[in-house]
C-alpha cells in the first residue's frame, strides 16, 4: 500500500507542482499574519526550518534568525534560491538533518498532501526528530469544517487553473503589486508540494448510493474568471482580500448532488459533450467561495444572490489552449492524468470493500494503456469518511476534459480535533501548546518535550 500511495502522490502532487512551478517565478505574496507572528516571536539567532517552503515566502520574515527552506519540488526550490533564500531539495519523510538541529520548524499546508495516516505521522515525527527539546513546531492543514464549503469525503482533488495565473492583477486597481496565483495575502498561504507532496485519494464510493456524483473539485471548464471582485475589505489588505474572492470561485472543492450538478451543466454548454463532463472520472463541479489552499469564510461579493451562477459565464470565442495540459504531465502508466485505474484486485490502495460487480481495469500503478474506461467516483449521500468504497466504469471522456485533470492535486482535509489527536496518540515527543481554526485551516503549535525517549 505504501508503494501505491507514493506512486499516486507522485502523480497528483509532485508532478502537478513541478509542471506548474514556472508560473510562480514572477509571482509573489506576503507571509500570512499568524505564521509571520510565529516566526517573529523566535529568539534572535535561532535556526528555523521551513519544511515545504515552496518559493520561500516565509524565509525572509525575520532577519534576526537564520532560516533554511526545503521542498520536494526542485523547480520551486530554484525559484526560492533565485530570490536569495537558502534552500534545498529534500523529502519530509526522510529529512537530511541531524537530530535536534532546529530551534523552530514550520509546516504550512504540507501534511494534508500525505495520503495515509501512517505517512502523515511519519512526516510529523521526522520534523519532531530534528527539533531541539523545547523547540516549537507550527503545522497548518486544510480543515473539513468550513462555513461556505462542504466536503463529502476527507480525501479530495483540487484543480490548479493556469488561466488565473495569466490574469492581469492590474484589474484589481493596484498595478505593480504581485502575488502568487491563488494565494491571497490574508488567509491563503502557499501550500507547497514539499515532501508532504504525497497523494492518494478515495475516488470511489458505494455502488448502491442514491447520488450519482460526489464532486470534490471545482470547474476548470469555463473560459474566463467570472467572479466579480468586491471592493470591500480593509485598506491595507483590500487588494489581497478582494482578489482572493475571485480566486476562491475556482480553487475549491465541495460536493453537489446530481440534480444540482445537472442544473449547472444546463446553464453552461461550452463543451461538445456536457454529458461526458458530468460523468468524468473525477467529477468537476462549480464552487462557491473557497480558496486555493485555505478556505476563507467570506462570501464572494456582498451583493451576489446566486453564487453558483456567478462562476458560470459564456466563454470567449478564443481558443482554450490553457485547458490542455503540457505533455510533461503525462502519467506513470502512459495515460492521460485524469485516467484513474484500480489495481489488480479491484481495490484502490488495497481497499477491502470492493464488490464483484465492479469491473477491474488493470493495475493502478503498473497498468498499460490497454484499459479504455474511466472510473467514476460514487459516494454515499451521508458519507464523509475517507475509506475507499466501490466504483463503476463509465464511458471514455473528451480529451480536453482528460487534459484538465493534469493539474488535480490531492488533499486530505482534517476534521476538527484530528490533527491534535494525531499528535497526542502517535507523536508523544510533542506537547500541544495551542490549536485553532484559521481561515479554513487547522493550526497547531506544539513544543518538543525536554526529555524524550
Swiss-Prot record:
Classification via PANTHER family: ALKYLATED DNA REPAIR PROTEIN ALKB HOMOLOG 8 (PTHR13069), TRNA METHYLTRANSFERASE 9B-RELATED (PTHR13069:SF36)
Function: May modify wobble uridines in specific arginine and glutamic acid tRNAs. Acts as a tumor suppressor by promoting the expression of LIN9.
Residue ranges of coiled coil: none
Residues annotated with Phosphoserine modification: 214
A GO MF label: tRNA (5-carboxymethyluridine(34)-5-O)-methyltransferase activity
InterPro entries in UniProt: AlkB_tRNA_MeTrf/Diox, Methyltransf_11, SAM-dependent_MTases_sf
Disulphide bridges: none
TM ranges: none
A family per Pfam: Methyltransf_11
Protein's name according to its UniProt entry: Probable tRNA methyltransferase 9B
GO terms classed as biological process: tRNA methylation; tRNA wobble uridine modification
Sorted UniProt keywords: Methyltransferase, Phosphoprotein, S-adenosyl-L-methionine, Transferase, tRNA processing
Top-level taxon of origin: Eukaryota
Gene3D superfamilies assigned: Vaccinia Virus protein VP39
A cellular component term, taken from the record's GO annotations: nucleus
EC number in record: 2.1.1.-
Similarity comment: Belongs to the methyltransferase superfamily.
Amino acid at each position: 500500500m505504501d508503494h501505491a500511495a507514493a506512486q499516486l502522490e507522485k502523480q497528483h502532487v509532485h508532478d502537478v507542482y513541478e509542471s506548474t512551478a514556472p508560473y510562480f517565478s514572477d509571482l509573489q505574496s506576503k507571509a500570512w499574519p499568524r505564521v509571520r507572528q510565529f516566526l517573529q516571536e523566535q529568539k534572535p539567532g535561532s535556526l528555523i526550518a521551513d519544511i515545504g517552503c515552496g518559493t520561500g515566502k516565509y524565509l525572509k520574515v525575520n532577519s534576526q534568525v537564520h532560516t533554511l527552506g526545503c521542498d520536494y519540488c526542485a523547480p520551486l526550490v530554484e525559484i526560492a534560491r533565485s530570490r536569495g533564500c537558502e534552500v534545498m531539495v529534500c523529502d519530509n519523510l526522510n529529512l537530511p538533518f541531524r537530530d535536534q538541529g532546529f530551534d523552530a520548524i514550520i509546516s504550512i499546508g504540507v501534511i494534508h498532501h500525505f495520503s495515509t495516516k501512517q505517512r502523515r505521522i511519519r512526516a510529523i515525527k521526522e520534523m519532531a526528530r530534528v527539533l531541539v527539546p523545547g523547540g516549537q513546531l507550527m503545522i497548518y492543514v486544510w480543515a473539513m469544517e468550513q462555513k461556505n464549503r462542504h466536503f463529502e469525503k476527507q480525501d479530495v482533488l483540487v484543480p490548479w487553473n493556469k488561466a488565473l495565473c495569466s490574469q492581469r492583477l492590474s484589474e484589481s486597481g493596484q498595478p505593480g503589486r504581485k502575488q502568487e496565483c491563488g494565494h491571497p495575502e490574508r488567509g491563503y498561504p502557499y501550500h507547497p508540494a514539499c515532501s508532504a507532496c504525497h497523494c492518494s485519494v478515495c475516488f470511489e464510493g458505494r455502488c448502491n448510493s442514491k447520488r450519482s456524483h460526489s464532486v470534490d473539485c471545482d470547474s476548470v471548464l469555463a473560459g474566463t474568471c467570472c467572479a466579480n471582485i468586491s471592493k470591500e475589505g480593509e485598506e491595507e489588505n483590500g487588494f489581497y482580500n478582494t482578489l482572493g474572492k475571485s480566486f476562491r470561485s475556482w480553487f475549491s472543492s465541495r460536493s453537489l448532488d446530481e440534480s444540482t450538478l445537472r442544473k449547472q451543466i444546463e446553464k453552461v454548454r461550452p463543451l461538445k459533450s456536457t454529458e461526458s463532463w458530468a460523468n468524468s472520472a473525477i467529477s468537476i463541479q462549480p464552487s462557491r467561495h473557497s480558496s486555493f489552499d485555505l478556505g476563507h469564510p467570506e462570501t464572494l461579493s456582498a451583493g451576489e444572490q446566486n453564487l453558483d451562477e456567478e462562476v458560470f459565464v459564456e466563454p470567449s470565442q478564443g481558443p482554450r489552449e490553457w485547458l490542455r495540459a503540457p505533455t510533461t504531465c503525462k502519467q506513470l502508466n502512459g495515460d492521460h492524468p485524469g485516467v484513474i485505474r484500480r489495481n489488480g484486485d479491484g481495490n484502490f490502495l488495497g481497499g477491502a470493500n470492493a464488490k464483484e460487480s465492479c469491473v477491474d481495469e488493470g493495475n493502478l500503478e503498473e497498468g498499460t494503456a490497454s484499459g479504455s474506461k474511466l472510473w467514476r467516483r460514487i459516494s454515499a449521500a451521508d458519507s464523509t469518511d475517507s475509506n475507499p468504497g466501490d466504483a463503476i466504469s463509465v464511458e471514455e471522456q473528451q480529451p480536453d476534459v482528460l487534459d484538465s485533470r493534469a493539474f488535480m492535486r490531492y488533499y486530505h482535509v482534517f476534521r476538527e480535533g484530528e490533527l491534535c489527536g494525531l499528535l497526542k496518540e502517535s507523536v508523544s515527543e510533542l506537547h500541544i501548546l495551542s490549536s485553532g481554526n484559521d481561515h479554513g485551516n487547522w493550526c497547531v503549535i506544539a513544543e518538543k518535550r525536554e526529555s524524550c525517549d
